[in-house]
Swiss-Prot record:
UniProt name for this protein: Peptidyl-tRNA hydrolase
Intrachain disulfide bonds: none
Pfam (any one): Pept_tRNA_hydro
Subcellular location: Cytoplasm
Residues reported in the UniProt entry to bind tRNA: 14, 64, 66, 112
Gene this protein is translated from: pth
Record-linked NCBIfam families: pth
PANTHER family: PEPTIDYL-TRNA HYDROLASE
Residues forming the catalytic site: 19
Function: Hydrolyzes ribosome-free peptidyl-tRNAs (with 1 or more amino acids incorporated), which drop off the ribosome during protein synthesis, or as a result of ribosome stalling.
Site (Stabilizes the basic form of H active site to accept a proton): 91
Catalysed reactions, as listed in the record: an N-acyl-L-alpha-aminoacyl-tRNA + H2O = an N-acyl-L-amino acid + a tRNA + H(+)
GO molecular function, one term: peptidyl-tRNA hydrolase activity
Gene3D superfamilies per the UniProt record, alphabetical: Peptidyl-tRNA hydrolase
């Protein structure tokens, strides 16, 4: 069983912002596998389904980004999911737009949502899909809560689809295979 968590902030004002990339990827997976994310529990919205023979729980925390660990730990404990089977999808400023990076473990890299998850799980050993949003020329908060330009949106839509495939690959083939397949790929207009 896998817990697939997309990080983001709830509310219409955050829809399609850089910081909500995790929510967008989870929505793509939900659509592909006909999973309705319409249940409220674990301080978030979630739905259950399958990818092949694997049961998956799709979770969108409603705690706001910096407290995402509260939602993740509740769902992981309820379903008794191993940390190695918790996949977290989130935006990453240290990666260029058009790229993603799959990792099996690691530090928060300055991302407060991941930092909070690491604190609550008491571990940094969980797979993640880091979706590049590029470096800001402006205030970081304004940047991550801002929306992509039209040109960037074209690239991001393709990266979101690739990120969903990377998550599915982790479930079906394992982290190493997903890393080999998706790390280093760059999407351009």
């Amino acid at each position: 069983m896998y817990l697939v968590v997309g990080l983001g902030n709830i509310g219409k004002e955050y829809k399609k912002t850089r910081h909500n990339i995790g929510f967008d990827v989870v929505d793509i997976i939900a659509e592909k596998y006909n999973i309705e994310i319409n249940r409220q529990k674990f301080k978030g919205s979630y739905g259950e389904g399958r990818i092949g023979n694997e049961k998956i729980i799709l979770l969108k925390p409603s705690t706001y980004m910096n407290l995402s660990g509260e939602s993740v730990i509740e769902a992981a404990n309820f379903y008794k999911i191993d940390k190695e089977n918790i996949i977290v999808i989130y935006d990453d400023m240290s990666i260029d737009i058009g790229k993603l990076r799959v990792r099996g473990k690691g530090s928060a890299g300055g991302h407060n949502g991941i930092k909070n998850i690491i604190q609550h799980l008491n571990s940094d050993i969980f797979p993640r899909v880091r979706v590049g949003i590029g470096q800001p020329d402006e205030n970081v908060v304004n940047y991550v809560l801002g929306k992509f330009s039209k040109d960037q949106r074209e690239i991001i839509e393709k990266v979101l689809a690739m990120s969903a495939k990377a998550c599915i690959s982790i479930v079906e083939d394992g982290v190493t295979e997903a890393m080999n397949k998706y790390n280093g790929v760059k999407i351009e207009v």
